[in-house]
Amino acid sequence: NLKEICDEIFGPNCFVSNISWQRTYSKRNDSKGIPAEIEHILVFSKRGQWIPKRLQRTATMDEGYSSQDGDEHEWSSVTISAPGAATHQGMVYAIQHPITGELLYPPLGRCWSFGQAQMLECMNEWTDYELRIINDYEKRCEICGSDRGVSKETNAIMLKKPFETAQAEALNRYNQGIKKERPWPLLYFTAKGKGGLRRKQYLNK
């Protein structure tokens, strides 16, 4: 076993990774048995606890970062959804927009990137929210691509206060960011506060 031999030579604490790569990509019909298309490269470091040297950031990499809401840290806009709705059904639920009242869902086949507790915490920075059953089973099945395993009752993140009150608070919060008086929360709304939900990705993260 090459791994065991290398462990004796370099020390098991210097093992970094076993890199597997497929050396043949084109289809072949001349095999006389089971072809060995995968090769392995064992990587060891001179010293234990090896950390790769990261590339320095360039000005081009930083071009997409700014602070349009007066945040002391520059950020870029990234999606707040991730693939895998079918396998993360508990992360598929509605979030009520505080300014339009619309119910926001992840795109088809996707789920929210954060767990519901964290999403609720983020939304509470706009106005008061609560968890509530709204009977949107069919909509969640549509997003997950199937009704298999989808819970009949999943909480949505809904406005706790009357809509007019919540809307006024959220609009004030949004305008504070426009005036750069107070940065927007981690999750913010596009299209002058009336669009979809996005996440701030900070430059130093």
Whereabouts are the PLM-identified features?
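Class I S-adenosyl-L-methionine
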Residues: 1-205
